[in-house]
């Protein structure tokens, strides 16, 4: 069995607890469905947000989603000055590390913009 990475990203309409939780759960549900994942398959999840999101941790949404035993980590994306014109506001990103026998090519990433 190997560990594979699955990336996902979405944006949220506002910096509020409800918006962050709703957007994060929607993202995780899509990734879990597209990749046929159960919480036991997930070795860890690393969430990042753009610095304009501070109302809630995406990991708190993952706990509400049922990932109580999954190791989770949150952080902010680096504020690289040259990237500011290209960066998405209110963006939530996740890197899932999953235990699987499937090849990397079988993993399905997700990007969604509100």
Regions found by a protein language model. Give the residues of each.
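Terminal domain-initiation and capping elements
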Residues: 1-114
